[in-house]
Amino acid sequence: MTIIAEKALYGVSVPVVGTYANTMLKLDITKHCEIPRGAKIVAANHPSTTDPFFVAQMLHQQSFIMINDVLFQVPMLGAYLRKSGHISVKEGHGQEAIDAALKHLAAGHTIVIFPEGIISPTEGGSHQAKTGVARLALESGAPVIPVGIGLIRENIYHVSSTVR
């Protein structure tokens, strides 16, 4: 997808994600350092499905998220993710995802990765981290910005819906 289309979709997404984050999440962001511009790898834990929204809201700059391929199979969402330049991570095809992320990093972009690869256990703790962050950092030389997400489940508003 062209850079112009990615930037246009990002421009449309910012107010949508911001509205969602500010409406559905109680965010308390504490920065211990300024987030630099340019190529970087943002590595965050993954306690809930809302984490990409949280990280996007925190960064205030375009980023490309490494996302499980399952979400790319959802009809409208998948099309949006592809056209926005996000990176599909398909089981057994990790090198393809790494290569796509390395291209973004070489272009000076920000990559967001959830090292666990899946949502953390609901009872706390985390899954074993995969090697993607280290591989990207070693191959690209880009700095890694660690992000810790402390989730208080009561601070997430739940909206029930049924699709018929």
Predicted regions and their residues:
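Helix-adjacent hinge/juxtasegments
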Residues: 86-110
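Hydrophobic/aromatic ligand-binding patch that stacks against planar heteroaromatic rings
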Residues: 55, 80, 103, 135-139
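A cross-family acyltransferase "interaction/gating" segment
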Residues: 31, 123-164
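Short, basic, glycine/proline-bearing loop/turn elements
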Residues: 16-17, 83-88, 116-121
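Residue-level preference for the first positions of well-ordered beta-strands
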Residues: 39-41, 110-114, 145
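Catalytic-site beta-strand/loop segments enriched in glycine and acidic/polar residues
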Residues: 104-133
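A transmembrane-helix-recognition feature enriched in membrane-embedded lipid enzymes
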Residues: 1-30, 54, 61, 75-84
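Catalytic core of membrane glycerolipid acyltransferases/transacylases, capturing the structured
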Residues: 36-93
